[in-house]
């Protein structure tokens, strides 16, 4: 992503190779600050407190968390301790477990003296893979947008609705749901994005920050405005991300995604999910089996932003002592999804389509579970 003319990724290794640097997303879009993570404990805090967020990025930072841990204690006990520390930070996003399992499976049979270097190399490999996957999703998704553009009068704008932030800030680079939009924009297809504010963490502000940095027209809307826009023909398609997708195609994503899918279904608006393969949980069929994270009620009862003095602060919006139900995710059944935009192409949201497209990965994942 370009910020004031300079390209950034969301995570990178420091110049001295001893730390992992991230962009503190809790300060965006008001302040751009880089934080150096120097331990597995700091990586865990960064994930838990949402300095970084988005399923793919969480996985990458967790992998680097293991590498950071190997700097301090590469013993069997240390490896397991860092795994246990990181795995409990965010229970819903499957990329976290996928990345940590990959790290521990590779490191556990190595000599202690070899683990540090291999851990850093593998974490970097996982990061590079994420960039490649997301760019491919963008290329395939841009064709979906092009097909819709071709059905409209020449020069007409394609209006796309997205929920939460599944862009560059949710991955290492490019993003998932926003990657097709970036590619379409680069290819000269006129697009406009309806950006859900996405309460309570207001990730829509992050999406607006991204799109604005790339010069892509967009409008920030209240979460409940999407259905109205669809009823009036102002949405050509929806593209969202996913934190975990089951083997049969049910999608767990940011709370409110399900309601957007229902509105899209009722108004015959195509509803696509940008799906990188590491986000598929082949061990779960029914989306109801996915653990749904419940976060601190303060996120619900307070708003975090910048005050007139230019300071970041919390503002209470509810009576003191109000009980809050802060569910972070919901599940959209596969029947409401038009298709998955993956790194290998676009497929139907069904068990058979996913199994056909990713037969090799499914087999490998299930074999790993058996061991």
UniProtKB/Swiss-Prot annotation:
EC number of the protein: 5.3.1.23
Deletion consequences: Inactivation of the gene precludes growth of the strain with 5-deoxyribose.
Keyword terms: Amino-acid biosynthesis, Isomerase, Methionine biosynthesis
Enzyme kind, highest EC tier: isomerase
Site (Transition state stabilizer) location in chain: 164
An MF annotation (GO) of this entry: S-methyl-5-thioribose-1-phosphate isomerase activity
Catalysed transformations (reactions): 5-(methylsulfanyl)-alpha-D-ribose 1-phosphate = 5-(methylsulfanyl)-D-ribulose 1-phosphate; 5-deoxy-alpha-D-ribose 1-phosphate = 5-deoxy-D-ribulose 1-phosphate
GO biological process assignments: L-methionine salvage from methylthioadenosine
InterPro entries: IF-2B-related, IF-M1Pi, IF_2B-like_C, Initiation_fac_2B_a/b/d, M1Pi_N, NagB/RpiA_transferase-like
Pathway involvement of the protein, from the record: Amino-acid biosynthesis; L-methionine biosynthesis via salvage pathway; L-methionine from S-methyl-5-thio-alpha-D-ribose 1-phosphate: step 1/6
Matching NCBIfam families: eIF-2B_rel, PRK05720.1, salvage_mtnA
Function summary: Catalyzes the interconversion of methylthioribose-1-phosphate (MTR-1-P) into methylthioribulose-1-phosphate (MTRu-1-P). Also catalyzes the interconversion of 5-deoxyribose 1-phosphate and 5-deoxyribulose 1-phosphate. Part of a bifunctional DHAP-shunt salvage pathway for SAM by-products.
Family, similarity comment: Belongs to the eIF-2B alpha/beta/delta subunits family. MtnA subfamily.
Protein name (Swiss-Prot/TrEMBL): Methylthioribose-1-phosphate isomerase
